[in-house]
Amino acid sequence: KADDLFRRLEIYVFGDPRYEGIYTDMLSKTYGCLRYVNKYRTVAVDFVKKYPFASFMDERHIDRSSALVKDGVEINAVFIGFGKTNRQIFLTSVANNQFITEGADGIEIKQVKYHIFDKNAAENNKNLNHTYYRFRTEMKNADKSEYLPMPQLPAQEFYHQTDINEVKFYDEIEKIVTAGANDVNFIVIAFGNDFENIDLAHKLIEKRREWGANVNIFVKIRREYDGISLFDGKECYVIGNESKCVYDIHTLKGSVLYNMARMRDEIYALEYMVTSEGRVPSEEDIERCRKDTYKAWFRDKLPLERESNLYCCLSLRSKLNMMGLDYCKKEEQGEALSEEEYAAIYAKDFPIDKSSYDRDVEGKKIIRYDLNFLPSLRTNLAVQEHLRWNSYMISKGMIPATIEQIKNEKDEKGKPTKGKNYRLRRHGNITTQEGLVKFRKIVARITSKSEEECDVIKYDYQIMDDAFWLLDKNGYKIVRK
């Protein structure tokens, strides 16, 4: 069959982001044999995967028992240059480097402060206005009574229209990175060619030493310079090597994030057979499910949905880091935690219920969720996951649906949309935890189902509840950081 052939055929297209819509339309008609690669997004994902901000934070900054950022800690990210690379790194970072802290009304986002330096007025950008800033602009004057509780803005941005040759350039950066003794600071350099970026990186390394500041420096270098040692040790991290993270076919084909995202999509379809249909999947069921979910991944899911699944897996390492853990390949150094040891850290105050179903699917125990989400590290990370998802959706230009749309909107087939309308770029779940409880009550009424059946909060638990299984199946282990 043609779709089976397409499943074995992979064609990678490295296209200009300006024409991404053309490739996206073609991709949906080829069952996944055509893969569009946006090099700027690939560089950004590689950066966030290798260097999540949480990996540079320790007990001075995060309470490992709760994953909450401590009082008196600020997280600052300085972007030097705001062209295609740094703009995409900013959006990918906003969608993944999300932290939580204790606020007046419970857990809330600990906003990262992004300081953007560019010689041009970088805040005036049609792409950002169409995507990331849509939520801020359109919701600012909206009647809040028509919506579920509004989520926070994902981050704070400060724009500095400054040339690197101006005297105030270093002065302004020094003020940012020396403001607090417990602050965590990041500088991402991507304003010019390789040599310009390298030169500024060396100057900032010297300045960091003079300032006595805690600053992690990253520099974009596109090419590999064989035999040349550009930096000593970890004084500066090189990002954006296109031959390794963009144009290497083995990296593209073997993407662990893609594999994990696809595996999660498949396993939850199989679990549905057990939890909703009450039957044990046969080998034929499993193979058919693999084919069906593979086709649906490319044919039915929008790029927004596929990337959402990918970013969920991308956030896994950051969440582990918040607990003082990490993951690495099984053959690498570091003593692996057992599943029991992982659960004792992650879920000791709110155990995972794996006993309600007497069978597993593909080696993964099926987890039972009710509506009793207890205060715990496990729950905090689920809250963080929803706040991260909110931020991802906002970064893509999505806005909340109104309560009226959640209650009454129907699609072309007459089915309730529950406020989810990708064509009009809105979603009923872009809200707070309180809003998600109200959402399930509304949906339970309009569908005549129980609240437990209509709950969506449980989905925010899944990535960490299933982390051990997911990493193990992909050749990785969980270790202490």
State where each predicted segment sits.
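Cytosolic regulatory regions of ion transport systems
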Residues: 1-288, 292-392, 397-414, 432-472, ...
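Basic/Trp-rich segment in TM-proximal cytosolic loops or flexible interdomain/linker regions
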Residues: 417-427, 431, 435
